[in-house]
């Protein structure tokens, strides 16, 4: 597994009535970081549909440790790890100036589009993220 780093500046639409980043926005950033990482290794949504296999989210979680604010520069470190035959987890660490401010985890299931059922993750897909 190798880390991928996604960088973002917290925009105005992410800020809640308390003046810090809304916790729901973590999921938006997790999705953006995941898509960027997948694109970087060649596992785009288009590539998934072409081979007839996709990733679907089973569970999403985030833990806020320290609030992010408007215009904060955040680095999101993410990596994947196979957790079973047809499941993989993506882990996230949100950092500001090197300090951990949040963590996240997304559990994915690998789905065969023909059967709409879970399928064992092919070795070549695991290798893309290793």
Regions found by a protein language model. Give the residues of each.
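Core beta-strand residues in small-molecule sensory/regulatory alpha/beta domains
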Residues: 93-95
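Hot-dog-fold acyl-thioester-processing enzymes
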Residues: 1-58, 112-130
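Hydrophobic beta-strand-centered segment that forms part of the acyl-chain substrate-binding groove
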Residues: 37-88, 101-102, 109
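A structural microfeature
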Residues: 102-104, 120
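Residue-level recognition of specific faces of alpha-helices
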Residues: 26-29, 91, 107
